[in-house]
A protein has these predicted regions:
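Long, compositionally biased interface segments
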Residues: 179-235
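Extracellular-facing segments of soluble proteins and assemblies that are Gly/Ser/Thr-biased and enriched
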Residues: 76-155
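Secretory targeting and sorting signals
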Residues: 1-23
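Short, surface-exposed, low-complexity cationic segments
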Residues: 164-187
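Conserved, mostly hydrophobic/aromatic
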Residues: 158
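Active-site-proximal beta-strand/loop segments in catalytic clefts of secreted hydrolases
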Residues: 138-142, 166, 212
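Short, hydrophobic/proline-enriched secondary-structure or compact coil segments at domain edges
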Residues: 69-73, 103-110, 124, 205-214
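N-terminal segment immediately downstream of the Sec signal-peptide cleavage site
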Residues: 24-72, 234-235
Length: 235
């Protein structure tokens, strides 16, 4: 679960204390912070250092834009519980999902390639009904297991997913890893509605893309987003 999600912030919102310079972080960036829950508004999006778990280790976020940003994160070796979810975030005014004709995004991301002990995944995190229903779409998984149990399999625009359900959470776990690609969020929501898992009256609250990080084997590791777009078309 990803808690303590930031609301839509004014342009002068959180700028926590800047982190010291690390070799892995670009020398000249527009914004950088090591503050938990630090956030930066850019282009109608929020780049968010979401260290939501109280036991999270240190994490420095940097950004040139909502399309190009990253984190250097150090999380305890052997940990399997998610500690942080640094992400790019878009807030919505709770339109009915049924009123959205198209909702999809494109991404280009990278995680530590050969890091031993890495436990993390890249994923969309979609919140419905004022944060009461959570739908995730995992695209690049290294060691994580969704909560709950498999309730079915979905083929969405040629991509095959195992669909998991636990509590009020749903996860579409891609059957292979992709570091660049596109996720069809609206089609995933329609699958859940058509199978009776979420109500047809569900509303869209928030869309995020980032990494759920549980462990970096107690080493500072780099996660980078080098391309991102989100397209929403209402009926």
């Amino acid at each position: 679960m990803r808690r303590a999600l930031v609301p839509l912030l004014a342009a002068a919102a959180v700028l926590a204390a800047a982190a010291p310079a690390y070799a892995a972080i670009p020398a000249h960036v527009k914004w950088k912070s090591s503050g938990a829950f630090a956030a930066w508004n850019n282009g109608g999006f929020i780049v968010y250092n979401n260290e939501w778990n109280h036991s999270a280790g240190p994490q420095t976020i940097w950004a040139d834009s909502y399309r190009h940003w990253g984190v250097e994160s150090t999380q305890q070796a052997g940990n399997t519980a998610v500690e942080t979810y640094p992400c790019v975030q878009k807030n919505y005014d709770n339109p009915p999902v049924s009123s959205i004709r198209l909702l999809r995004n494109g991404f280009a991301e990278s995680m530590p390639g050969n890091a031993r002990g890495l436990d993390a995944e890249a994923a969309d995190d979609v919140w419905l009904n004022n944060y009461n229903i959570e739908v995730m779409i995992w695209v690049d998984n290294h060691g994580q297991r969704p909560s709950g149990n498999v309730i079915g399999h979905a083929t969405i625009f040629g991509q095959r997913f195992a669909v998991w359900h636990g509590g009020t959470d749903y996860t579409f776990a891609l059957d292979h890893n992709e570091t660049t690609g596109m996720t069809h969020i609206q089609a995933s929501l329609r699958w859940l509605i058509s199978h009776g898992y979420i109500p047809a009256s569900a509303t869209l609250t928030q869309v995020n893309f980032g990494w759920e990080i549980a462990s970096t084997n107690s080493k500072a590791e780099d996660f980078k987003l080098t391309g991102y777009w989100l397209h929403t078309q209402r009926s």
